[in-house]
């Protein structure tokens, strides 16, 4: 990947206060979610790749082997995560370029003389930027862990530092002397963006089939923001606002398990990313969401294309903890002899290959578009979720449980019995145990959607991949005591080279600090 200055800012020539330019800036934001970097690697396909990376860094989603996973395996193995490697470079560069697309939109609208339509566009730009910065803040904020001190190699304490804030109004001189924001500074910045988004996005009359955020999404982003800030009363309040305002309901069993439309139908979500046959990601055939997440195609990096291809699996112990009466268990291939084995819905044309090649615990959650397993021009022209209303139910339940575990328990039981498992009961009562149970059910719900990373890091939960009978392959069997050191992502070296305020203030390299677990 060619090194690109991550804190580029829009030039005055890019910003023109006209309806046509505002429209082009508006649609550039969802378009940039699916951007391929032509650098020889097959992981850089935009926002969806970052979702996948975050889940690979948890203890929930694993690649079955490292046969064809060279493009993503180092995030799972905690290798080469320092500032000089392409892996840290991709995430860092992608997000700041997405911010640039947002800043172009924001800078294109003067609120003092804008039309209602342009104010709606501004609201969308602010919401998009808030999503990006909230993701980055939670990925790059240095939090205490079991292996790496917050005192970096230069002797500076980076605890609580996030990333530099780049705005549409920032000049080049300030961008080149722009320090990492503290947690409080970043929180205030994102909250301000979301307050303005809330005010303006009501003027957005068309979300283009959910590729643009609406007011419910702004409420959902506020719920996520307040969870990060541990302002749980506010998080519960805005999660409920998101639920009440959303134009969608929780997905049904049919929605989730249909082999043609399961988790590829953007109409079921509050906000998503939609690819078409014209997207560069789809045109590559293999550098896209479906190729890496679906498991059910003959053309992807995972799936049936080769006899020894890799598959995305759910952690075995996580799978075993899911009740057999919870239909979400059918989003994964059951082991041989299980009563659920015949209930997991496979793509009809692929049943024979699924039986022959797909290992137990493999995901069938993300279906190729139209259930097309053989033509990437159709199957990869799919959608993936950015925000689902189900997440808001779990945020409301967890946030409530921090101060009232009995009420939190009641909320998670209500959601689960109504939408997922009629026999569900939360069998714990203490605050910590109720929170852990709610978060577990949220992890099951959002498996593969890139959100679990944030909860593991925020709540200081351990990641345990090495245990008797584990389905993690050897180099990924890493166990942590509390949040993993690798969840404090490292800024790429170019940021420090070009931004003097960041020089010497990077997070320490967390690579190779854990010992691989070996069965005795």
Question: Model-found features: residue ranges?
Answer:
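Conserved, well-structured interaction surfaces
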Residues: 67-142, 181-184, 198-206, 377-384, ...
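Membrane-proximal, proline-rich intrinsically disordered regions
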Residues: 1-53, 301-313, 318-324, 328-333, ...
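Short, surface-exposed recognition loops and adjoining beta-strand edges that mediate ligand/DNA contacts
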Residues: 47-51, 140-159, 203-286, 427-429
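Flexible, polar/acidic helix-loop-strand segments at domain edges
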Residues: 322-387
């Amino acid at each position: 990947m060619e090194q690109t200055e991550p804190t580029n800012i829009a030039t005055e020539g890019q910003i023109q206060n006209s309806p046509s330019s505002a429209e082009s800036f508006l649609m550039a934001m969802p378009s940039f979610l699916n951007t391929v970097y032509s650098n020889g690697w097959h992981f850089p396909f935009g926002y969806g790749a970052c979702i996948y990376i975050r889940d690979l860094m948890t203890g929930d989603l694993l690649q079955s082997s490292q046969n064809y996973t060279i493009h993503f395996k180092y995030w799972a193995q905690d290798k080469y995560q320092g500032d000089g490697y392409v892996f840290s470079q991709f995430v860092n560069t992608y997000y700041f370029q997405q911010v640039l697309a947002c800043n172009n939109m924001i800078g294109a609208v003067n609120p003092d003389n804008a039309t209602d339509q342009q104010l709606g566009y501004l609201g969308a730009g602010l919401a998009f930027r808030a999503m990006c910065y909230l993701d980055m803040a939670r990925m790059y904020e240095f939090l205490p862990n079991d292996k790496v001190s917050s005192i970096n190699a230069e002797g500076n304490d980076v605890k609580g530092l996030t990333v530099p804030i780049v705005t549409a109004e920032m000049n080049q001189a300030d961008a080149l002397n722009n320090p990492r924001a503290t947690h409080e500074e970043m929180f205030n910045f994102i909250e301000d963006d979301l307050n303005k988004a809330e005010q303006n996005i009501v003027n957005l009359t068309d979300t283009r089939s959910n590729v643009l955020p609406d007011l419910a999404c702004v409420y959902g982003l506020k719920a996520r923001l307040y969870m990060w800030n541990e302002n749980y009363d506010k998080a519960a309040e805005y999660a409920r606002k998101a639920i009440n305002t959303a134009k969608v309901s929780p997905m049904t069993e049919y929605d989730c398990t249909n082999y043609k439309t399961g988790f590829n139908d953007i109409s079921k979500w509050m906000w998503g990313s939609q690819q078409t046959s014209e997207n560069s990601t789809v045109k590559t055939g293999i550098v896209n969401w479906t190729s890496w997440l679906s498991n059910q195609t003959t053309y992807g990096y995972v799936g049936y294309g080769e006899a020894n291809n890799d598959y995305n699996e759910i952690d075995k112990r996580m799978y075993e903890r899911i009740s057999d009466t919870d239909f979400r268990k059918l989003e994964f291939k059951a082991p041989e002899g299980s009563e659920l084995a015949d209930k997991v819905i496979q793509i009809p044309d692929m049943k024979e290959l699924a039986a022959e090649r797909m290992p137990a615990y493999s995901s069938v959650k993300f279906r190729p578009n139209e259930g097309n397993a053989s033509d990437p021009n159709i199957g990869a022209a799919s959608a993936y979720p950015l925000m689902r209303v189900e997440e808001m139910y779990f945020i409301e339940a967890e946030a409530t449980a921090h101060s009232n575990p009995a009420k939190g328990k009641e909320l998670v039981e209500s959601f689960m019995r109504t939408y997922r498992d009629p026999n569900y009961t939360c069998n714990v009562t203490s605050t910590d145990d109720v929170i852990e149970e709610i978060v577990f059910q949220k992890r099951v719900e959002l498996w593969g959607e890139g959100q679990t990373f944030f909860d593991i890091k925020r709540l200081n939960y351990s990641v345990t991949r090495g245990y008797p009978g584990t389905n993690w392959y050897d180099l990924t069997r890493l166990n942590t005591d509390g949040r993993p050191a690798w969840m404090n992502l490292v800024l790429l070296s170019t940021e420090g080279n070009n931004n003097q305020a960041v020089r010497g203030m990077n997070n320490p390299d967390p690579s190779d600090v854990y010992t691989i677990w070996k069965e005795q």
